[in-house]
Curated annotation (Swiss-Prot):
Protein's name in the database: Peptide II.10.10
GO CC terms in record: extracellular region
Keywords recorded for this protein, A-Z: Disulfide bond, Secreted
Domain of life: Eukaryota
Other comments on record: Negative results: has no effect on voltage-gated potassium channels Kv1.1/KCNA1, Kv1.2/KCNA2, Kv1.3/KCNA3 and Shaker IR (with inactivation domain removed) and on intermediate conductance calcium-activated potassium channel KCa3.1/KCNN4. Does not show antimicrobial activity as well.
Family: Belongs to the short scorpion toxin superfamily. Potassium channel inhibitor family. Alpha-KTx 10 subfamily.
Location relative to the cell: Secreted
Length: 32
């Protein structure tokens, strides 16, 4: 688990999981 959430990395990881996009909330990657 990263301490700092990079929005671009989060977004790409969420896309790979089949989600539309990801955003960082309190340094945690949330997929939508």
């Amino acid at each position: 688990i990263r301490r700092y959430c990079d929005p671009r990395v989060c977004d790409r990881e969420c896309l790979e999981k089949g989600k539309y996009f990801g955003r960082c909330i309190r340094d945690i990657c949330k997929c939508n």
